[in-house]
């Protein structure tokens, strides 16, 4: 907003208007917007991810995906987890999807029971790092979306990992904080 008069500079909705489902009606946005080199990247649970010009608010591109986890911008790519447990690599300038990697979606894949939710990604050590509500810690190759490594942490995790001072911090839902170098 303009500090001189309190008026909004610009705004937009991240819910899809061309579909009539209960998901499209959701306006909840849990993911923080990411600002990088004059652009804003945002995703909402209502079914839209978009890129905007920071100052004018002009929508530069949009894709029809829903999510609640903050995207990660690395170089020319935006990485984001969707609400159906897909990790997407999206071109920063065009919104074109480079690759999609399907993460574990169900605790019981055969019966499709026990939905798994993912948070992240964060970028560190040349990898994308994500955690899940099933206690999974995964490392993904950002070039192709391939699983590089995984580990069962044994604890439910709903908060995104944090990277600071060459350390990876993971806070489990039971309060257990784990740090890796």
What are the language-model segments listed below?
Residues 2-5, 53-56, 92-94, 141-145:
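Short loop/turn segments that connect beta-strands within beta-propeller blades
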Residues 37, 44-45, 82-83, 132-133, ...:
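Structural signature of WD-repeat beta-propellers
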Residues 88-106:
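Histidine/lysine/aspartate-rich catalytic loop segments that bind and position anionic ligands
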Residues 153-181:
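Blade-level signature of beta-propeller repeat domains, shared across WD40, Kelch, NHL, RCC1
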């Amino acid at each position: 907003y303009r500090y001189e008069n309190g008026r909004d500079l610009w705004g937009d909705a991240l819910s899809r208007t061309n579909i009539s489902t209960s998901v499209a009606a959701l306006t909840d946005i849990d993911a923080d917007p990411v600002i990088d080199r004059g652009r804003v990247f945002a995703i909402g649970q209502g079914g839209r991810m978009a890129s905007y010009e920071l100052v004018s608010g002009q929508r530069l591109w949009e894709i029809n995906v829903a999510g609640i986890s903050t995207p990660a911008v690395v170089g020319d790519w935006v990485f984001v987890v969707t609400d159906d447990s897909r990790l997407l690599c999206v071109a920063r300038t065009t919104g074109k999807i480079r690759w999609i990697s399907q993460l574990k979606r169900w605790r019981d894949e055969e019966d499709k029971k026990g939905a798994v939710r993912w948070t992240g990604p964060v970028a560190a050590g040349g990898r994308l790092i994500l955690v899940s509500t099933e206690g999974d810690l995964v490392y993904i190759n950002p070039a192709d979306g391939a699983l590089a490594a995984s580990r069962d942490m044994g604890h439910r995790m709903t908060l995104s990992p944090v990277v600071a001072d060459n350390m990876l911090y993971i806070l489990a839902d039971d309060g257990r904080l784990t740090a890796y170098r």
